[in-house]
């Protein structure tokens, strides 16, 4: 049995990890670190855990040993947290859910943990950078195109995300009275996840140098991401669909539907649902996923499973909300 720790366990991604790890068959102990909730029971931050866990948050990581440590601090905090908890020199699997290590900079040894693109590289790795939620959805929509070398023209993306994608810190755009029955565009053509998407595209199709044109939107719901992607594609409809089916044949969490992809089919699961169509000369792909599970904490558990040699679906057999 394995010993896990979560640093930043009181937030949305930390709480989702806590729920997953408390029910993971290979995890014996979960240590939950929170500077804001130290000494308080888990249910103070996550009321739904009242019936499932009686433990309390701690202020600092114990000496361990730990088999895996998840970093769930804010963006720009992970280097400080690794230093504060003396993780740099430990031979412990560290999975970072922030954006701090997603791009290679010559100074860190984290690998990018998108299992559907780089899963074969993850077994035995000790440092994994978890992808962003929008980046996960967009990449799942276009990975087969890049793998075939079919990207040639600009990729146009419209995406909508739930309010939990912005974290727990109070913002004007997270108030119920603003978010409810409302829509807005933010960071058009400049979203921070574009850099990691481009890095993957450069790996899979080096000759493709265009920047995806991405319009992100805030949605009036709490969980979920839907992205709609279209680009020119010379492949026929049948060839296009066969390429997607072949690419994801061994991917347990990615599924193509012949119906319209929708959020309620995937919210609360680690699944991603794809709709793949050809309209004239354009390929149109829709990807739906849960931003907190497949787009964050569930993907982190998937990465843990791969890195530690566990069955990759272990602990991730979750029930969708459905309606």
Identify the residue ranges that each predicted region occupies.
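N-terminal Rossmann-like NAD(P) cofactor-binding subdomain of oxidoreductases
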Residues: 1-181, 186-188, 205-207, 275-279, ...
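Predominant activation on well-ordered alpha-helical scaffold segments within soluble catalytic domains
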Residues: 18, 139-146, 194-198, 241, ...
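A short coil-to-beta-strand element that immediately follows conserved catalytic motifs
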Residues: 29, 153-157, 209-213, 253-257, ...
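Anionic group-transfer/hydrolysis microenvironments
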Residues: 98, 102, 160, 218, ...
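Short Gly/Pro-enriched turn/cap motifs at secondary-structure boundaries
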Residues: 185-189, 217-219, 262-266
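C-terminal substrate-binding/catalytic lobe of Rossmann-fold NAD(P)-dependent dehydrogenases
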Residues: 190-256
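C-terminal active-site/capping subdomain that shapes the small-molecule cofactor and substrate pocket
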Residues: 227-323
């Amino acid at each position: 049995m394995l010993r896990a720790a979560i640093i930043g366990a009181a937030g949305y991604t930390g709480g989702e990890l806590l729920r997953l790890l408390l029910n993971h068959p290979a995890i014996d102990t979960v240590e939950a670190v929170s500077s804001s909730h130290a000494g308080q029971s888990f249910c103070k931050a996550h009321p739904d855990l009242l019936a499932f866990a009686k433990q309390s948050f701690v202020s600092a990581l114990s000496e361990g040993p730990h088999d895996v440590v998840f970093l769930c601090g804010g963006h720009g905090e992970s280097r400080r947290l690794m230093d504060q908890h003396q993780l740099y020199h430990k031979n412990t699997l560290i999975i970072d859910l922030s954006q701090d290590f997603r791009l290679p900079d010559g100074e860190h040894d984290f690998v990018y943990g998108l299992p559907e693109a780089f899963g074969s590289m993850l077994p035995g790795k000790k440092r994994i950078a978890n992808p962003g939620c929008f980046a996960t959805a967009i990449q799942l929509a276009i990975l087969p195109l890049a793998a075939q070398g079919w990207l040639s023209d600009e990729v146009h993306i419209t995406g909508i995300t739930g309010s939990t994608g912005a974290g727990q810190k109070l913002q004007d755009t997270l108030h119920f009275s603003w978010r409810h029955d409302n829509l807005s565009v933010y960071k058009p053509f400049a979203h921070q996840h574009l850099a990691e998407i481009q890095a993957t595209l450069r790996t899979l199709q080096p000759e493709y140098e265009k920047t995806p044109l991405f319009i992100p939107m805030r949605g009036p719901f709490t969980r979920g991401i839907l992205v709609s992607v279209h680009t020119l594609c010379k492949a026929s409809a049948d060839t296009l669909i066969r390429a997607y089916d072949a690419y994801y044949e061994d991917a347990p969490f990615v599924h193509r539907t012949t119906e319209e992809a929708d959020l309620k089919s995937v919210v609360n699961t680690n699944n991603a649902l794809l709709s793949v169509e050809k309209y004239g000369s354009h390929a149109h792909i829709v990807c739906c996923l849960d931003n907190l599970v497949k787009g964050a904490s569930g993907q982190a558990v998937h990465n843990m499973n791969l890195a530690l040699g566990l069955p990759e679906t272990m602990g991730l057999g979750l029930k969708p909300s459905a309606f």
